[in-house]
Amino acid sequence: MELNAFSSQYFPPIRFFADFLSQENPCIDVYENYQKQTYRNRCHILSPNGLQKLVVPIAHTGKRAMKDLQISYAQDWQKEHLRSFEAAYRRSPYFEYYEDDLMPIFEKKHKFLLDLNLEILEQLLSLLQVENKFSLSESYIESPAEDFRQAYDAKNPVEDLPEYTQVFSEKIQFIPDLSVVDLLFNEGPQSIVYLKNLKQQ
């Protein structure tokens, strides 16, 4: 079976989900080496002051496979991320609809980044009402049918996405390709329609 390779990501961006849902056999490559300053351990949300970058700290340096990467709890980053999500989305139309499914994630202390990211991915797929059909690699994927592992650049997010109403749209110009939670909290059940339309572009 030919696999389509994706990286494990922390509250992945919208474009990731559009691509992920368009593939027959999406596979998370858990053996790829961790790469700094990527969505593997960070996400972008829209705060009252504009784009906000949230980063999960890593416990060690040097090359490691994603499956072996441990999270650092030297600082209470979970409280910071939880407060940031609440400040950003408490006023959004669907925050109360989804908060009981997403906010408890910040109360768990996963040892490995991969486990945290996989729980987030599974929960987001459930909220999008999409069948959980992805697999995990058994080794590094050398020759995937399609390779999406480098497709999403946290430094240069995708800019040509259709606009939807964001929480602070009255004072902040639309920011595309934030974490898919931005779409969920603002569009709710219609989020899947937006993603399917992106798949066709």
Spans of model-derived segments:
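Residues lining hydrophobic/aromatic ligand-binding pockets adjacent to catalytic sites
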Residues: 1-201
